[in-house]
Swiss-Prot record:
Domain of life: Bacteria
The gene coding this protein: coaE
Protein name: Dephospho-CoA kinase
GO biological process per UniProt: coenzyme A biosynthetic process
Protein family according to the UniProt entry: Belongs to the CoaE family.
Amino acid sequence: MALIIGLTGGIGSGKTRAADSFRELGIEIIDTDQIAHELTRSAGKAISPIRIAFGDCFILDDGSLDRSAMRRLVFSDETARHRLESILHPLIYQETLQRLPLIQSEYGIVVVPLLLEIDGYLKLVDRVLVIDCPEPLQISRTMLRSKLSEQEVRDVMAVQCSRDKRLAQADDVIVNDSGEQHLQRQVEELHRKYLMLARKHGL
């Protein structure tokens, strides 16, 4: 199997933008947030167990998950959050496992916001890449992008591991605090490094 990089970072750190930059260089990306969206859209595999666990009030008329209502619930009710995670996390993990052997690029990237928090993912990856930025920037970016309140962003951050812990676990770090060009330079530098590692990995 190809060399696999686990890409992670806190909310608002720029994981998606970094992953898109690697994709533009020809690298295949498995995005667990995207998988979660697929699982919770109309007729997705997670809809039936979510309906059973939480009721019809969390399912929209089109059959997809009401993400806003669910977000409000899980960040005010830890038991509900654990119940949702017990449904989603195994499904996301199994889908990731199925996609990994299909990667055809010289190396692959798995984007996992909770890479360090959820058991199992670290054993799937060969290196951990952390996208990092100061916490005030995480908050302001997320509020601008997602229309969440500052408290809602902080609630998300509270269930993610700390910035210090992420950085301590990182094999590689991209500092995303200075605009697109700064990010792109770091991506291209790591891309060259990963290509060399991938060739050794395949020997």
